[in-house]
Amino acid sequence: MNGRKDEELKDLTLLGNQGTTYSFTYDPNLLEVFDNKHPDRDYFVKFNCPEFTSLCPKTRQPDFATIYISYIPDKKCVESKSLKLYLFSFRNHGDFHEDCVNIIMNDLINVMEPRYIEVWGKFTPRGGISIDPYCNWGRPGTKYEKMAEYRLLNHDLYPEKIDNR
């Protein structure tokens, strides 16, 4: 199998760009995608994003998290540098943890149209409580819809020991 051709990569404007600018304002338009060369196969792509930050919508204090994104692509995959810059754009975005993971998932669904996706935020404690929102989605009317229901019901059967992360 040959590598990707320049023509296939022409829409990726952020990867390899040495003049990267970081947006401090939430911007879903930063997300870029490329063609999945293996649409005939189910496989997971997982991103571990340990440097996510956003702001509490009330106090404007910073919140920190590791965001885990797993998806089964269909025709498109998200490009990782664009994902990094997109997640960075939450830096000054004021929203609750639950909102952030759902916004991330919705934006990725809009740009990729995956077969299945899940987003799990593991936020560091504030006030002695850590919050770990989880959301997922499977394409309606397919086996992925059933998969989403099953994974939601079973996503945290073996909770981790919390030691302030």
Curated annotation (Swiss-Prot):
Q: Does the keyword RNA-binding apply?
A: no
Q: Name one GO cellular component term.
A: cytoplasm
Picking any one GO biological process from the record gives: tRNA modification
Q: Which InterPro entries match?
A: GTP-CH-I_C/QueF, NADPH_dep_7-cyano-7-deazaG_red, QueF, QueF_type1
Q: Sorted alphabetically, which keywords does the UniProt record give?
A: Cytoplasm, NADP, Oxidoreductase, Queuosine biosynthesis
Alphabetized PANTHER family for the sequence: NADPH-DEPENDENT 7-CYANO-7-DEAZAGUANINE REDUCTASE
Physiological role: Catalyzes the NADPH-dependent reduction of 7-cyano-7-deazaguanine (preQ0) to 7-aminomethyl-7-deazaguanine (preQ1).
| Family in the record | Belongs to the GTP cyclohydrolase I family. QueF type 1 subfamily.
Q: Which HAMAP family match?
A: QueF_type1 (MF_00818)
Per its record, how is this protein called by name? NADPH-dependent 7-cyano-7-deazaguanine reductase
Recall the taxonomic lineage recorded for the source organism: Bacteria, Bacillati, Bacillota, Bacilli, Bacillales
